[in-house]
Amino acid sequence: MGKAQPLPILITGGGRRIGLALAWHFINQKQPVIISYRTHYPAIDGLINAGAQCIQADFSTNDGVMAFADEVLKSTHGLRAILHNASAWMAEKPGTSLTDVLACMMQIHVNTPYLLNHALERLLRGHGHAASDIIHFTDYVVERGSDKHIAYAASKAALDNMTRSFARKLAPEVKVNSIAPSLILFNEHDDAEYRQQALNKSLMKTAPGEKEVIDLVDYLLTSCFVTGRSFPLDGGRHLR
């Protein structure tokens, strides 16, 4: 008999940056991948051509979240993991509705993973002890807070707390952990002055790139014991 096809890994926000790097990492390992994307970047076509299932989704409403969950449920009988990478970033600033900022941040960072974890729970169960994973991507600001991005920090803190709650709910079949990055990689338009200021905020004074995240994700997926924990990726920034 042939070897059974691995269950897919679901990555939200898989069309660019860290989500895209994770998708290609798994594809190169012959691991089936399902990604969500909101905007059709050129990279999406490359993923489709490589065999990834790419589902356009709008997580700005609960109906959009559940419509995406329905598509996943129709496409697979099980999941190896869910990586909650989809994110948004809004600051409190003059002229911006504070209620809109808070609602947007809570919708993408709290409502979306909360609803998806419940809706897709049965796809994660039934595969054995510690055989499935959920990984929430939070942020360095969970511990420190942010005076300029209060709603963003609060929503990521809520997601961090949900990590422990879902770990209790889903053990021992499913491990649930979070990764809390600070600066991982720059945007192309970031100027030299900004880059240097950002690098100086950590002890390691470098932007490590996607591989640092990929290596930690691989560790969490491989572990048969670690659950309910948050893993900072901040280069010692908390010691500055």
From Swiss-Prot:
Pfam families: adh_short_C2. GO terms for molecular function: dihydrofolate reductase activity. SUPFAM superfamilies: NAD(P)-binding Rossmann-fold domains. One of its GO terms (biological process) is one-carbon metabolic process. Its EC number is 1.5.1.50, 1.5.1.3. The active site is at 152 (proton acceptor). It catalyses: (6S)-5,6,7,8-tetrahydrofolate + NADP(+) = 7,8-dihydrofolate + NADPH + H(+); 7,8-dihydromonapterin + NADPH + H(+) = 5,6,7,8-tetrahydromonapterin + NADP(+). The keyword NADP applies. Keywords: NADP, One-carbon metabolism, Oxidoreductase. Belongs to the short-chain dehydrogenases/reductases (SDR) family. FolM subfamily. PANTHER family: DIHYDROMONAPTERIN REDUCTASE (PTHR43639:SF6), OXIDOREDUCTASE, SHORT-CHAIN DEHYDROGENASE/REDUCTASE FAMILY (AFU_ORTHOLOGUE AFUA_5G02870) (PTHR43639). Catalyzes the reduction of dihydromonapterin to tetrahydromonapterin. Also has lower activity with dihydrofolate. This is Dihydromonapterin reductase.
